[in-house]
């Protein structure tokens, strides 16, 4: 029995080994066959296509500008332009539109809808403000008033007129002593304007205000200097820069053609070469023909790059002057006559608030609030 059992176990082992070997060989053959199979004709899986979204108009003008300072300004509200406007950061706003609607008076652009609804002067944006953008875009909101509201406000805009400046508290000597504002007084005056809620209109805005097309805040003021004397550059402009106040330098372009010393200084014309007296002691503005005046002012505008407003030398002007100014394409002329700009003021005879030596902060407040 034992001998027979051993034989059976031996045969069984041989059979099992044979089966295992067959399985191994067969499995290996199967693996070999799968690895070396002929690939089937399969349909490749579709890949997700890249979808290109078109740029918005605001994104497009920024892309076209190719400048990291570029900023697309979009406008919201009744009468707002549909197209965005290109501006540049590190500069002041330029040429913001003044829309028109029948029977309405535009009341400005604001940084928020709430600001527009409240006519918040602190939120109002114009060419006195630096361009500030987020992701190279900014949105401005329109506000409107009725003509009756605008007229009832009875806004009067002072145009401040400075000439030369002195660092001497006791002033300068000589017959032009009154022209030299003490720079300490000037600093206090500019600080007052900067910190008490004044609005600084552009000349475009002043023109629209005179027409009754634009409402200006009650506390509006325009800062100007005549002659572009070196003391303006050395003493006054640093103060203008410190307080970030829009100002105008009326330049005699035959005498000097300096570039604007600050983004807050607009160069405008004090004529090219008419700041000289004729034989009768009066300025060329009232001695020359309209054609001669227009030719001089055209030269000045070409040098300055703008022919918008002129300050009359010595304040002299007449109807011939006005004709020459209009022929040259200027909109406005500034006199030395005292007064305030109101709706309907003669654009070619703008009055001023003259600031002389000895007029401190109290004198300014008594004149402009």
Task: Mark where each language-model region is.
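Terminal targeting segments of Actinobacterial cell-envelope proteins
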Residues: 1-13
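N-terminal pre-catalytic segment of deacetylase/amide-hydrolase enzymes
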Residues: 110, 114-219, 358-369
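Secondary-structure capping and domain/repeat boundary segments
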Residues: 41-107, 111-146
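A cross-kingdom marker for long, charged
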Residues: 337-366
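Extracellular/periplasmic catalytic domains that process cell-envelope and extracellular macromolecules
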Residues: 66-68, 100-101, 132-136, 145-146, ...
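Hydrophobic alpha-helical membrane-insertion segments, chiefly the h-region
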Residues: 17, 22-34
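Metal-dependent polysaccharide deacetylase catalytic core of the NodB/CE4 family, i.e.
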Residues: 155-181, 216-221, 229-231, 235-237, ...
């Amino acid at each position: 029995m034992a001998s027979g059992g051993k034989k059976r176990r031996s045969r069984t082992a041989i059979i099992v080994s044979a089966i295992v070997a067959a399985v191994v060989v067969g499995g290996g053959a199967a693996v070999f066959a799968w690895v070396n199979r002929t690939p089937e004709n399969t349909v490749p899986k579709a890949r997700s296509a890249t979808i290109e979204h078109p740029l918005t108009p605001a994104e497009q003008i920024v892309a076209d500008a190719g400048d990291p300072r570029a900023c697309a300004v979009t406008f919201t509200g009744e009468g707002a332009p549909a197209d965005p406007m290109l501006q540049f950061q590190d500069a002041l706003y330029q040429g913001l539109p003044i829309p028109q609607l029948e029977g309405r008076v535009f009341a400005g652009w604001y940084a928020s809808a709430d600001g527009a609804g409240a006519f918040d002067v602190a939120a109002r944006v114009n060419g006195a403000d630096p361009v500030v953008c987020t992701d190279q875009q900014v949105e401005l909101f329109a506000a409107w008033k009725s003509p009756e509201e605008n007229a009832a406000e009875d806004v009067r805009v002072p145009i401040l007129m400075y000439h030369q400046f002195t660092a001497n508290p006791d002033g300068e000597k000589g017959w032009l002593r009154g022209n030299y504002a003490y720079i300490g007084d000037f600093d206090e005056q500019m600080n007052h304007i900067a910190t008490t809620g004044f609005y600084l209109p552009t000349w475009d805005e002043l023109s629209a205000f005179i027409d009754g097309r634009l409402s200006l805040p009650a506390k509006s003021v325009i800062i100007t200097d005549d002659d572009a004397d070196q003391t303006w550059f050395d003493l006054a402009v640093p103060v203008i820069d410190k307080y970030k106040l829009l100002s105008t330098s009326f330049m005699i372009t035959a005498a000097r053609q300096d570039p604007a010393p600050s983004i807050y200084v607009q160069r405008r014309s004090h004529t090219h070469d008419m700041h000289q007296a004729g034989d009768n002691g009066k300025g060329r503005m009232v001695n020359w023909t309209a054609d001669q005046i227009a030719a001089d002012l055209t030269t000045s505008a070409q040098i300055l790059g703008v022919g918008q407003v002129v300050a009359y030398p010595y304040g002299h002007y007449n109807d011939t002057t006005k004709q020459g100014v209009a022929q040259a394409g200027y909109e406005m002329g500034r006199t030395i006559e005292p007064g305030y700009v109101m709706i309907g003021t003669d654009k070619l005879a703008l009055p001023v608030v003259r600031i002389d030596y000895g007029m401190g902060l109290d004198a300014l407040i008594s004149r402009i609030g």
